[in-house]
Structures are given as structure tokens and as C-alpha cells.
A protein has these predicted regions:
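Bacterial N-terminal signal peptides
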Residues: 1-8
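Sec/Tat signal peptide C-region and signal peptidase I cleavage site
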Residues: 10-14
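Hydrophobic ligand-binding cavity/cleft-lining segments
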Residues: 17-167
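Structured segments of extracytoplasmic/periplasmic soluble domains
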Residues: 110-113, 217, 255, 259
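A mature extracytoplasmic/lumenal domain signature
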Residues: 165, 179-181, 189-193, 218, ...
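Hydrophobic-ligand binding "helix-grip"
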Residues: 174-211
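Beta-strand/loop substructures that line and gate deep hydrophobic ligand-binding cavities in soluble
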Residues: 199-238
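A conserved amphipathic terminal alpha-helix motif
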Residues: 234-268
Length: 268
């Protein structure tokens, strides 16, 4: 489990829409200058840049009209397929005073994903996103095991877990620990089984990809950056649902940094 809780309130700020904490379902448009494509904090400065500690997380849903249909993922992600159906980034700073091992322990606590809630734009209410989640001994979903420990999450390690999602049912995921040091954690997650909605395939293996970058800034502050992509061949049932993608990404961000997942305002 995560070893800390944030004492302050950190709502989510969209790059294109700002939600007032007092009126969580109302928004006001603000002008935003044209931005380059997303850039994780590797090789170059991150885009979008990190907000200051205490400011809302910066959440951005990127459009094909801005980036083009053949958008190429940043090289450091290792993703090779061009284009996307949905693309969401989150940049934030958060307070954390323990060592990186505590974050690794939380990341490896797969069973703790159960119960994560998100804002459903369809039902206009908070709903449970993850019903159950289990660490696996390998890519076979029948082999449940205890949560992963920090000692197992070494750089280069590949781990598997199973997740029962409210929206897409049961699926198996691969988690690759890209970097693991005292000051930087990088890991990527992608589905290795087909994801279905009422038995209808909506995402084939490798079509839901996410990458997370956690960097220590000081003894009390860490930086968070995530990029989540659904492939351009995703089923039309989810291909155009940007709000759902945003709210799912926000739910995982909040869970990781210790913010209650139902804290107002919702992501979008």
C-alpha cells in the first residue's frame, strides 16, 4: 500500500478546460497557445511541463487534428506504432518523503488496484473502475500470486498482472520496469490479451499502452509524468471517448500519489 496521504487538496487541471473545485461539473474555456506534441521527461524537457508543487496536475488529451494521423511516439517510449485513437498525458509534482522503495512497493501492490473509482461521464457519477486485480506468476491468467515486492521490481524486469475492469472486463497486462534507482522510476504497461466489451473485441494486444515516469526532485518532492495511448485501430466504441480516457488516467494518477480517487473535481 502507498505509505503516505496528501494533506492538501490537489484537483486536476486540464490544458484546455479548468474545473472549479466548488462547481465540479462546470467549466470555463481558456485560451491555450499551440503546443508541440507530448514529450516524456527523457532526452528532452517534458511537454507539458510540470506545474509547481501545490498546483493542480496538468492533464491533457491530445487530438489527431493537432498532431496528425501518423503521429510518431517519442523514441524513449519504445513504442513503434504510429498514430492513436486517444492520447492522454498527466504532469504533476507531489510531496513524498520516503525512499523510492516505498513507491515501488505501492506500484507492485496490484491487489490494491481493486476499488479504484473514476468519474463516469455517461452516468454522471463516481463508479468503481477496477473490480479485482491480481499479480500473476507469468502471462497465464490462472496463475495468481501475492503482490510484487520491491526486490522483484528490478530494472529490466517484466511482470504480469490481471485486472477486471468495469469497462473492458478481464485482461492480462505486462509491466516492464524500464528504470529503477533511488531517484528515478520508469515503468510501462500494456495489454497482452484482447480486451472486450460484452464479448466484442475493442482493443487487441498491445493497443493500450501507458508509461510512467517518477523522478525525485528533492527529499520532499517527486515529479510525476504519464502518457497513455490507445492504438489507432481501437474499436469505435472507445476510439472517440476522450473523456473516459482522461478520467481513467486521472484515477490511476491519484491512486499512485495518494489522492482519494473520488476527490472533487473529476478529471473531465
Amino acid at each position: 500500500m502507498l505509505l503516505f496521504l496528501l494533506s492538501a487538496v490537489y484537483p486536476v487541471r486540464s490544458a484546455n478546460l479548468f474545473f472549479s473545485p466548488r462547481v465540479p461539473h462546470a467549466g470555463s474555456l481558456i485560451d491555450v497557445e499551440a503546443r508541440p506534441g507530448p514529450q516524456p521527461p527523457c532526452e528532452k524537457e517534458p511537454v507539458p511541463a510540470y506545474p509547481q508543487l501545490g498546483e493542480p496536475a496538468l492533464v491533457q488529451s491530445w487530438s489527431k487534428s493537432d498532431l496528425g494521423r501518423d503521429w510518431k511516439p517519442p523514441t524513449c517510449t519504445g513504442w513503434t506504432e504510429e498514430g492513436f485513437s486517444t492520447l492522454v498525458t498527466i504532469a504533476a509534482r507531489f510531496p513524498y518523503t520516503s525512499e523510492a522503495e516505498g513507491l515501488l512497493r505501492h506500484i507492485g501492490a496490484i491487489s490494491q488496484l481493486a476499488g479504484i473509482r473514476y468519474w463516469s461521464t455517461t452516468h454522471k457519477q463516481w463508479r468503481t473502475l477496477i473490480m479485482n486485480a491480481y499479480a500473476l506468476t507469468d502471462s497465464k491468467p490462472a496463475q495468481h500470486r501475492e503482490d510484487f515486492t520491491p526486490n522483484e521490481m528490478k530494472e529490466g524486469k517484466v511482470l504480469y498482472f490481471e485486472q477486471f475492469d468495469k469497462l473492458t472486463g478481464k485482461a492480462t497486462y505486462r509491466m516492464h520496469i524500464v528504470e529503477a534507482s533511488a531517484s528515478r522510476l520508469v515503468f510501462e504497461v500494456e495489454n497482452v490479451s484482447t480486451m472486450r466489451y460484452y464479448f466484442l473485441p475493442i482493443l487487441h494486444p498491445g493497443e493500450l499502452q501507458s508509461m510512467y515516469f517518477l523522478d525525485r526532485e528533492s527529499d520532499k518532492v517527486w515529479r510525476y509524468y504519464s502518457i497513455v495511448r490507445t492504438g489507432k485501430n481501437a474499436n469505435g466504441l472507445i476510439a472517440g471517448n476522450d473523456s473516459s480516457s482522461v478520467n481513467r488516467a486521472v484515477a490511476f494518477y491519484r491512486s499512485l500519489v495518494g489522492i482519494p480517487t473520488t476527490q472533487e473535481p473529476p478529471g473531465r
